[in-house]
């Protein structure tokens, strides 16, 4: 009767072709999920510190290594810097621009004439690697808004430099994606790089991606007002955040903001074509909120009345209490900024207010002069709905729940609005609005029925399986093993309406993480520290903790192999060993010369030439064609050392492996005519 015998998973070093090494076992080093002692108390300094780090994990482009604070992230999608300036074909390589448009504006789009357009930079949307325009713009402006409103919190906790790095990375990308002619007129703006349908089937580190990443542009023929206005808003806020510390950079941001808004003013007001790029992933439903969001910031900066005149025809005074501030509904934020503009005088010197805003709006919109209207009253109405269940649902444990997708995202956005309200309406002191926000944040940090923090790495009871390829380091999201890296500061989707939550990597509802989910969370942490911060709230020192390499000394530059062997004996003493291996690494630098060797002894054999090796499965070839592992051998190792030692070799010439792993399965052994003893193999 045929029997099988299993060898447990082993760790072996993986050889680079530049250095041969023996395969030996090495210990597994476990990642800790917390950088300090577990705590269930709400520490808003620590929460603010951690919250910014999520963006280090989602940086994209040729400058990731210079800017990220995570050792496990490196430059990725560097080919975004050389997108072929051509209409995309069936291979999805190129742009959505027509050849005639490219020919007409080649000097603007490709000033160096190399045939490419540079769109590197920015941030991956979520655990995937597409750069979607709406969440990119929203996250950029919302992070900037939080810094603008609660700058002291960042400075007191030592986080100003970090948030400024993130804000520059966002806004530098938005400027790079905006193509101006010699008159500073916007000719084109790239609002998306990558395609969700192409990107989403993969589950690997961004550093090794090689899939097609088409670029999507808006132009005067297809203006897509929501995209261009949302980008203008972020750049306008960026001006306010840097005008006192880097005035030249601030002016550059403002110039781009004005140019983008002028494009939106001049061209037909048009909702984005959701089929051209975002498809079903981010379906924008209106442009008016983004347009007013940008115009409000530009008035606040310039005092130019034309920006208020642009708001009046499209302003929806009644919208804010009907939903929560988010990428597809900016009205809650718009109402806050218009509330600031409606003040008698600005809170900060050099900015502008217009106390007659509501009066002029009523006249413009043919409203009754007797109708009670007040921007801040509208904001307070929204907050009271969040608090009492007038909008959404209050869970049994008191959590404000709005939507299945990203409940924590909406909850923290509502918190941010409540905290901004108290800043301007309660002399910067907490009222019932801030108290409500504080209780909601305490819930998310661990004061909930599950005693679970919905912020990755915050304490020992934090969620541990965010839906994120780079932190996962595994071959598929269904893998339930511990993730390779801790995605510190990421706010996951959150609980459902019954306070339940499932902590699984594959669950992209409960455990989704995105740049828009974290954006208001960062600002809310800063606002809560402004309201409640004291000396008991301290940041984590020496953060993030240094990760230990899992590769064994003498290994291939932080490359190693996890392997599992199953023996399959045949009658008469013959048999084979089925080897399943995964190449793994802590390196963020892709290598294309990976080789793995499996050594075995032929001491029991009469004729080693009968040994055969053959491939059973190559995940790289299946998922990343034309990548293809090649198995060869057997080869004698060194007859002078031991004539009985042989090895088989698997190599992936030309395939990049970094911060990820792919399964490879092969057989080695004898089917007849000799004795196979796997007990002395390694």
Task: Enumerate the language-model features and the residues they cover.
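Aromatic (Trp/Tyr) and acidic
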Residues: 38-53, 57-142, 146, 192-230, ...
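Bacterial N-terminal signal peptides that target proteins for export
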Residues: 3-17, 28
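Low-complexity, acidic Ser/Thr/Pro/Gly-rich terminal tails and inter-domain linkers that flank the onset
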Residues: 541-574
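A surface/secretory-pathway sequence property marking extracellular, secreted
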Residues: 603-653
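Terminal connector regions
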Residues: 657, 663-682
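Sec-dependent signal peptide cleavage junction
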Residues: 25-39
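Aromatic-lined, polymer-binding surfaces characteristic
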Residues: 228, 232-242, 250-254, 260-299, ...
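Short beta-strand elements of extracellular/lumenal beta-sandwich folds
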Residues: 563-592, 598-601
């Amino acid at each position: 009767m045929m029997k099988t015998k299993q060898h447990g998973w082993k760790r072996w070093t993986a050889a680079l072709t530049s250095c041969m090494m023996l395969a030996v076992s090495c210990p597994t080093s476990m990642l800790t999920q917390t950088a300090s002692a577990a705590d269930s108390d709400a520490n808003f300094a620590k929460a603010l510190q951690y919250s910014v780090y999520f963006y280090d994990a989602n940086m994209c482009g040729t400058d990731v290594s210079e800017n990220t604070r995570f050792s496990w992230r490196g430059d990725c999608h560097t080919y975004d810097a050389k997108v072929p300036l051509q209409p995309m074909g069936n291979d999805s390589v190129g742009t959505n621009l027509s050849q005639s448009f490219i020919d007409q504006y080649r000097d603007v789009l490709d000033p160096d004439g190399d045939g490419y357009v540079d769109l590197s930079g920015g941030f991956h949307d979520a655990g995937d690697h597409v750069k979607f325009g709406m969440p990119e713009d929203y996250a950029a402006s919302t992070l900037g808004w939080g810094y603008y409103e609660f700058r002291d919190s960042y400075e007191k906790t030592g986080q100003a430099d970090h948030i400024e790095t993130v804000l520059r990375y966002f806004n530098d990308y938005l400027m790079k994606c905006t193509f101006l002619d010699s008159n500073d007129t916007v000719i084109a703006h790239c609002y998306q790089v990558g395609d969700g349908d192409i990107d989403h089937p993969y589950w690997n580190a961004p550093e090794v991606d090689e899939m097609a990443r088409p670029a999507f542009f808006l132009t005067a023929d297809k203006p897509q007002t929501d995209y261009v206005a949302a980008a203008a808003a972020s750049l306008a806020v960026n001006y306010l955040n840097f005008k006192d510390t880097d005035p030249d950079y601030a002016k550059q941001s403002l110039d781009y903001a004005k140019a983008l808004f002028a494009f939106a003013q001049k061209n037909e007001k048009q909702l984005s074509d959701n089929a051209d790029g975002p498809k079903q992933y981010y379906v924008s439903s209106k442009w008016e909120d983004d347009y007013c969001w940008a115009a409000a910031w530009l008035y606040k900066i310039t005092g130019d009345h034309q920006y208020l005149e642009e708001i009046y025809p499209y302003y929806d005074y009644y919208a804010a209490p009907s939903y929560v501030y988010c990428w597809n509904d900016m009205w809650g934020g718009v109402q806050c900024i218009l509330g600031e503009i409606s003040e008698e005088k600005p809170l900060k010197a050099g900015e502008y207010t217009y106390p007659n805003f509501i009066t002029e709006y009523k006249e413009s919109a043919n409203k009754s002069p007797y109708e009670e209207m007040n921007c801040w009253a509208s904001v307070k109405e929204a907050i009271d709905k969040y608090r009492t269940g007038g909008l959404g649902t209050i869970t049994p444990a008191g959590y404000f729940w709005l939507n299945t997708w990203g409940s924590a995202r909406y909850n923290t956005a509502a918190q941010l609005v409540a905290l901004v309200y108290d800043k301007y309406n309660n002399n910067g002191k907490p009222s019932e609005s801030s108290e409500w926000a504080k209780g909601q944040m305490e819930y998310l940090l661990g004061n909930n029925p599950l005693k679970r923090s919905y912020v990755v790495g915050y304490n020992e009871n934090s969620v541990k399986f965010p839906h994120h390829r780079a932190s996962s380091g595994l071959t598929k999201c269904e893998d339930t093993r511990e993730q390779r890296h801790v995605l510190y500061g990421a706010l996951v989707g959150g609980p459902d309406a019954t306070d339940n939550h499932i902590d699984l990597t594959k669950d992209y509802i409960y455990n989704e993480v995105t740049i828009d989910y974290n954006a208001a969370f960062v600002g809310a942490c800063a606002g809560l520290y402004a309201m409640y911060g004291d000396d008991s709230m301290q940041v984590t020192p020496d953060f993030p903790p240094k990760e230990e390499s899992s590769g064994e000394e003498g290994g291939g530059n932080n490359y190693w192999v996890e392997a599992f062997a199953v023996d399959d004996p045949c009658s008469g003493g013959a048999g084979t060993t089925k080897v399943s291996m995964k190449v793994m690494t802590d390196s963020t630098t892709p290598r294309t010369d990976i080789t793995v060797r499996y050594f075995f002894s032929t001491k029991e054999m009469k004729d080693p030439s009968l040994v055969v090796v053959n491939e059973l499965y190559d995940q790289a070839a299946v998922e990343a064609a034309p990548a293809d592992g090649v198995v060869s051998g057997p080869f004698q190792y060194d007859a002078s050392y031991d004539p009985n030692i042989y090895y088989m070799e698997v190599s992936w010439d030309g395939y990049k492996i970094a911060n990820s792993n792919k399964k490879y399965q092969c057989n080695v052994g004898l089917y007849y005519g000799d004795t196979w003893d796997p007990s002395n193999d390694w």
